């Protein structure tokens, strides 16, 4: 939103292992849009059950650099054509932000100064790996009140107390189905989850974050509604859209004054 990054420009990274001719490395075609849509085309690591063996999970426990690991995957598909949920794709987006900011201290202060403090998310901690890089694919410690503030910012189209913190274009991006999900139900946008084609009885404009073990922030503009749910679930043990359906049942439908 500050004009430092563009969704459709190549990331411009140095990749590992280095190609004999880096300028012709096919990974150079990967854009910020691709990684935020979870469709980089890079090899599967986390989603293949290897998160804590060779994937992003190693960085959680003072292991290798999260960013170097994210840049060390081979390209196995054309970017933008196949959806695969990978923490490493998010970490590539974080690295792109670091390069765009260009100053380590500003990078570390950026989330709090430009977002968290402005909306009062004072109980939220964004962890880094041991090299000082944010692990924004995970390791974000927060509480329900802060998540509610985050959801309210999106419900208000990026405005907070009269100040625009997030552009409407960004909000449109995060709640637009990733092109690569067209064949699998359109259930994912830009780092946010969507009801998709198969969630009956759910407003089509709803969208939701999803944290480990059932941490959800659901935004429903058509009902002026934000729902925060905290949990400690086993994988697949809770339906955020089922929760939304039950909440909507409890809200009386508006009727015209007579």
Q: Positions of the model-derived regions?
A:
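Alpha-helical scaffold elements that line and support the substrate/ligand-binding pocket
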Residues: 1-4, 35, 70, 84-115, ...
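Active-site helix/loop module of the DD-peptidase/beta-lactamase fold
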Residues: 2-42, 72-75, 102-138
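Stable alpha-helical elements in mature extracytoplasmic
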Residues: 7, 11, 15, 28-32, ...
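Solvent-exposed loop and edge beta-strand segments that line ligand/cofactor-binding
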Residues: 23-26, 77-86, 135-141, 209-216, ...
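Amphipathic alpha-helical interface segments
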Residues: 50-73, 79
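Active-site-proximal binding-pocket segments
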Residues: 111-112, 116-176
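Active-site Gly/Thr loop motif
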Residues: 121-128, 171-226
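Structured C-terminal helix/loop/strand segments within mature extracytoplasmic catalytic/sensor domains
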Residues: 206-258
């Amino acid at each position: 939103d500050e004009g430092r990054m563009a969704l459709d420009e190549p990331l411009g990274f140095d990749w590992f292992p280095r190609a004999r001719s880096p300028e012709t490395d096919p990974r150079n075609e990967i854009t910020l849009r691709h990684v935020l849509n979870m469709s980089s085309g890079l090899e599967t690591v986390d989603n293949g059950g290897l998160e804590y063996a060779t994937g992003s999970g190693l960085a959680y426990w003072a292991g290798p650099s999260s960013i170097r690991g994210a840049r060390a995957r081979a390209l196995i598909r054309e970017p933008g054509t196949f959806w695969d949920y990978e923490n490493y794709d998010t970490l590539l987006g974080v690295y792109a932000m670091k390069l765009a900011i260009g100053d380590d201290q500003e990078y570390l202060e950026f989330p709090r100064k430009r977002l968290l403090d402005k909306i009062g998310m004072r109980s939220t901690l964004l962890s880094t790996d041991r090299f000082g890089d944010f692990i924004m694919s995970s390791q974000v410690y927060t509480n329900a009140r802060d998540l509610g503030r985050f959801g309210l910012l999106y419900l208000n189209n990026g405005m907070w107390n009269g100040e625009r913190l997030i552009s409407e274009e960004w909000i449109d991006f995060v709640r637009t189905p990733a092109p690569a999900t067209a064949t699998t139900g359109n259930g994912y946008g830009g780092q946010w989850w969507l009801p998709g084609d198969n969630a009956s009885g759910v407003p089509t404009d709803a969208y939701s974050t999803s944290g480990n073990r059932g941490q959800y922030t659901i935004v429903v503009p058509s009902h002026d509604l934000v729902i925060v749910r905290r949990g400690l679930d086993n994988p697949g043990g809770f339906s955020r859209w089922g929760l939304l359906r039950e909440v909507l049942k409890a809200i009386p439908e508006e009727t015209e004054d007579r």
